[in-house]
Structure formats: structure tokens, C-alpha cells
């Protein structure tokens, strides 16, 4: 609750500052010039959220995760956002966890907190009725675990889905053990997990 209240206060402050800088056009504009890991574009009542690390196939690293979490908190505190569209720039929606960051958390407790409290899956689940995720290219690990929480998922016919964690002796860390069986059933999820 404290985290949500802090996020709401930060979002209010951000909106106020951006209104002062931009006039009353809104608080989310296309920021491609700055190379942000997540781009936000407000179009009326719709917030477009784009994963923006195409050179890394939108690998789900710390910066992208934190920026995505911030972006997904906006519709929770701004009731004028009726719809969220989440997609990815470049050839893939999301290639899963950023392998350059694996094993870099200082301890197991921090890693657990990041997985259970710091990820985007819970926010996507909370926004399920208002969010559409558009998938293309490769959707690996977090790239399918998080979208599976959404109310509407649209995938290009050539999209490739993979959950390699189990074959590496790991548990899917972005909520896939919950989201994927709920979305496609436990038997299909099991097949996806072990193949």
C-alpha cells in the first residue's frame, strides 16, 4: 500500500511538472530521442507503452523492468486512462531476462523481493480488463509470462513462445507459473515449460 501511495504521489508530481513544461497536452509523450527503455505515448484515453531496447530484443533487465513498472502504475492512479496497449520495438516483443544481469542481485532476499514485489506481472494482472498486449517475434520467459496476465493478448502468427527456465533448472521468475496455466491451461503450460 505504501508503495502504491508513493507511486501515486510521484505520478501526480510528474504530471504537474510535465504540464508546466508542455502545457495541457498531457503527461506522456513520445520520448524516442532519449533512448528510454520504455516509451509512453498518450492518445486520448489510451496509453501506448512500448518496450524500447530493440538492440537487445527488449531483454527484461533492471532498467526496462523498472521503467515498465512505472509506466503500468500510471493507469492505476490516473482514472482518465481507460486503455493500455503494450508492445515491443524491433524484431521481438521481449527475449526474456537480460542474461548480462543474471546472478547480479546482492543476495537471495533481494532477488526474492524483486521477483515478488518489483515485477510488472502483478500490475498487468491488476489492469487485466484495460490492457492489450501485442506480441511479435520471440516471446521468451518474461516475454510471455507477463503478457499472459493481460485481459487481451494479440500475437502475430509467426510469434515464437519459449520458457527455457525449467530446462536450465530455474523457476519462471516473472509470474509464469501462475499466469500461463491460467491463460492456456495446466497441460499446455506444462508442455510449454518442458519443451
Regions found by a protein language model. Give the residues of each.
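Hydrophobic alpha-helical membrane-association signature
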Residues: 64-68, 116, 146
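Conserved CoA-thioester-binding segment of acyl-CoA-metabolizing enzymes
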Residues: 15-89
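Hydrophobic/aromatic residues within transmembrane alpha-helices
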Residues: 49, 86, 98, 146-148
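Glycine- (often His-adjacent) and acidic-residue-rich active-site loop
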Residues: 88-123, 139, 169
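Nucleotide phosphate-binding site architecture
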Residues: 57-58, 100-103, 190
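Crotonase-fold acyl-CoA enzyme core
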Residues: 123-195
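Crotonase-superfamily enoyl-CoA hydratase/isomerase domain that binds
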Residues: 1-26, 175-195
